[in-house]
């Protein structure tokens, strides 16, 4: 469990064994680094209410939390969660923790528990050419 201490230090409450970390390759980005990444997003992109952001290996949601906090300077939280943020996370416990931290339900269509390599990225919306005909 020596590596689990790192995961707990980045804001997660999920206990992960070393075996789990070995088998899943889970690596969690510290909140300070997430905030630094978000600070590099141009203000015009953050202000644009049509901008969308995807984290396809969301873990417990640190990047999305940092982004959500920054977007709240320009938009209402409901608009951000329902129109701007999207996430895919493989592990059900990470997914549940991410949703709780973001203030959304686990069945919110923008925040899915799925394998990012096989997910269709529809987020509950119809996809394909026929949608635009």
Residues of each region from the PLM?
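SAM-dependent methyltransferase catalytic region
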Residues: 1-133
């Amino acid at each position: 469990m020596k590596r689990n201490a790192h995961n707990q230090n980045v804001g997660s409450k999920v206990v992960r064994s070393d075996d789990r970390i070995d088998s899943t390759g889970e690596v969690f980005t510290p909140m300070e680094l997430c905030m630094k990444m978000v600070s590099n997003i141009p203000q015009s992109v953050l202000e644009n209410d049509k901008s969308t952001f995807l984290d396809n290996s969301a873990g417990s949601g640190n990047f999305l939390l940092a982004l959500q906090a920054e977007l709240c300077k320009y938009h209402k939280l409901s608009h951000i969660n329902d129109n701007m943020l999207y996430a895919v996370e493989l592990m059900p416990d990470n997914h549940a923790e991410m949703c709780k931290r973001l203030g959304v339900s686990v069945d919110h269509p923008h925040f899915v528990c799925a394998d990012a390599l096989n997910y269709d990225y529809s987020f509950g919306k119809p996809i394909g050419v026929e949608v635009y005909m």
